[in-house]
From Swiss-Prot:
It comes from Caldanaerobacter subterraneus subsp. tengcongensis (strain DSM 15242 / JCM 11007 / NBRC 100824 / MB4). The lineage of its organism: Bacteria, Bacillati, Bacillota, Clostridia, Thermoanaerobacterales. Its EC number is 2.3.1.286. InterPro entries: DHS-like_NAD/FAD-binding_dom, NAD-dep_sirtuin_deacylases, Sirtuin, Sirtuin_cat_small_dom_sf, Sirtuin_class_U, Ssirtuin_cat_dom. It catalyses: N(6)-acetyl-L-lysyl-[protein] + NAD(+) + H2O = 2''-O-acetyl-ADP-D-ribose + nicotinamide + L-lysyl-[protein]. Zn(2+) binds at residues 133, 136, 158, 161. It comes from the Bacteria. Residues 4-250 form the Deacetylase sirtuin-type domain. This is NAD-dependent protein deacetylase 2.
Length: 250
């Protein structure tokens, strides 16, 4: 790991990215804080400092207390949908367009990478665009879930079969989606991973940094993989990416 001032860290990161044969990016909640979405674990500001996620956004609550899930947990999910991408999201989209990165793996469910124009996005924790019927599998829009909840249809029911609807978000207790298998393959084929805004404590996504030779971490707080990283940058995502991207283009 390199201990340098920010200017030299940006330079080192840019050099690693330019020399990489295939670079993937892994993003966590920290990339979206500048869009007004609270992250989950930062001291003093983390969303889970005030509530237990396993008691709010879990399959246990969804199945055993669906009313509680839709009155508390669902509101958290719904609140993320009004956010807009910030500079960091747009830079990653531009980097993908220019062939500098191969794609983005995200732990986020806020859809901001797609809003910013990123094409190859692996949403390993699901999304807030769709929902599904637990009985017949019918796909519905997240907007329909919101409409039903707003009309006090709690839990919301499938118009086709009457089964309970749920958002297509990976809850605590859910298996990982197919997107994770695809993301895993991408990382195994890469020689560099850029981690942005993730504390790297949530399994199994936190295994990914150990599968590549090159590692850049941009995060506000320490991670368990700092010791392995070639570069660790303690700056806001947009500021760090702006400087790195300018160096790559120069």
């Amino acid at each position: 790991m390199f201990f340098m001032d920010s200017k030299n860290l940006f330079k080192k990161a840019a050099e690693l990215i330019k020399s990489s044969q295939k670079t993937m990016v892994l993003t966590g909640a920290g990339i979206s804080t500048e869009s007004g979405i609270p992250d989950f674990r930062s001291p003093g500001t983390g969303l889970w400092e005030n509530m237990d996620p396993t008691e709010v956004l879990s399959t246990k609550v969804l199945f055993n207390s669906p009313e509680e899930f839709y009155r508390v947990g669902f509101k958290i999910l719904s609140s993320m949908r009004n956010a807009e991408p910030n500079e960091a999201h747009y830079i990653l989209s531009e980097m993908e367009k220019e062939g500098i990165i191969a794609g983005v793996i995200t732990q986020n469910i806020d859809n901001l990478h797609q809003k910013a124009g990123s094409k190859k996005v692996y949403e390993v924790h699901g999304n807030t665009r769709e929902g599904s019927c637990l009985r017949c599998g019918e796909k519905v829009s997240f907007e329909l879930l919101e409409e039903k909840v707003a009309k006090e249809e709690i839990p919301p029911r499938c118009d086709r079969c009457g089964g309970m609807l749920r958002p297509d978000v990976v809850l605590f207790g859910d298996p990982m989606p197919h997107a994770f298998d695809l993301a895993l393959k991408e990382v195994q084929e890469s020689d560099l991973l850029i981690v942005i805004g993730s504390s790297l404590v949530v399994a199994p996504v936190n295994f990914l940094p150990g599968m590549v030779d090159g590692l850049i971490i941009i995060n506000a707080t320490e991670t368990p993989y700092d010791y392995k990283a070639d570069v660790v940058i303690r700056e806001k995502a947009s500021y760090a990416l702006r400087n790195i991207w300018n160096l790559i283009k120069s």
